[in-house]
């Protein structure tokens, strides 16, 4: 392969998780490179123990002289996370797997006043599609299970338009330079295909940047911090903390719902919600309502918008 296969994803997207799993199983690359803290690479086997998901990698640093505050960050994994499915699929085909992102302690805290073209592009898309927010837009465009075949090209086009010609802020440029070095190193081995799983915002830039990296015999080294203690370990996490509505900016709304969509598919997940949250035994006519209304809703909206309708009906009994 003369080019790495760079798969831009949205973190914790069931559709992207299915795509990543399918690509690794069909392409069988020798290297699977995943956006995640590279300081955990020496302990990556710990991720394959019998965990109860979600779990998270916690990376931290503590300055010994107290001159600066310490820093820490979590990298969470749920079953429906593309990164988690990449790890599992890579393990099954015995690919060499590495995390390729800078841990939080190696990332710059520099403030950048560059305009946020991502928000501008999102705003244009929301106006064009008349969607309420970026989560609804994402569902509308990508979480439809019937569109899985077209998903790779749709994602590539979407993220290319989203990134445009923006250089990114200082932090993203620093992270992308490090990730590009990892891709360049894997390609320079010239002994097998390379597949990269990264946030879609980074994908268009990494597809070009890796070519500019100098040759490296060994895997890229992490920067060192003077007078600081750094480390990382696995920790339990919670579904609530995965929710974008709880303040986790890289999350998806309603992570329990996302997990059900991953396990069962959209329609069965909606039926499961109806059964679980119905306060009383439903009559036959009540059970028939969604089966009659859903096709009508689909005529009015995109199919995946029915997920929201399912959810609302299950929790409140209300339908439009």
Regions found by a protein language model. Give the residues of each.
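Compositional signal for N-terminal targeting/processing segments
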Residues: 1-320
């Amino acid at each position: 392969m003369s080019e790495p296969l760079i798969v831009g994803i949205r973190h914790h997207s069931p559709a992207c998780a299915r795509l990543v799993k399918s690509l690794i199983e069909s392409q069988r690359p020798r290297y699977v490179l995943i956006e995640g803290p590279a300081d955990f690479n020496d302990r990556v086997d710990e991720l394959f123990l019998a965990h109860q998901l979600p779990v998270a990698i916690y990376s931290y640093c503590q300055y010994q002289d107290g001159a600066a505050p310490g820093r820490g960050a979590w990298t969470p994994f749920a079953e429906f996370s593309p990164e988690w499915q990449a790890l599992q699929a890579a393990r099954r085909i015995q690919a060499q797997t590495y995390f390729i992102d800078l841990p939080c302690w190696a990332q710059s805290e520099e403030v950048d006043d560059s305009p946020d073209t991502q928000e501008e592009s999102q705003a244009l898309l929301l106006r064009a599609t008349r969607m309420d927010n970026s989560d609804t837009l994402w569902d509308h465009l990508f979480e439809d299970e019937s569109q899985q075949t077209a998903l790779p090209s749709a994602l590539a086009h979407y993220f290319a338009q989203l990134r445009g010609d923006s250089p990114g802020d200082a932090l993203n440029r620093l992270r992308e330079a490090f990730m590009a070095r990892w891709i360049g190193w894997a390609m320079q081995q010239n002994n097998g295909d390379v597949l990269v799983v990264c946030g879609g915002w980074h994908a268009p830039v990494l597809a070009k940047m890796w070519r500019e990296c100098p040759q490296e015999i060994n895997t890229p080294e992490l920067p060192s911090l003077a007078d600081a203690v750094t480390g990382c370990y696995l920790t339990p996490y919670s579904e609530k903390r995965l929710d974008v509505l709880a303040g986790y900016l890289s999350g998806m709304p309603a992570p329990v719902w996302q997990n059900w969509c991953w396990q069962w598919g959209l329609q069965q997940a909606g039926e499961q919600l109806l059964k679980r949250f119905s306060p009383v035994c439903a009559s036959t006519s009540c059970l028939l309502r969604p089966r009659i209304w859903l096709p009508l809703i689909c005529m009015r909206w995109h199919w995946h918008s029915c997920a929201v309708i399912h959810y609302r009906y299950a929790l409140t009994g209300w339908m439009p």
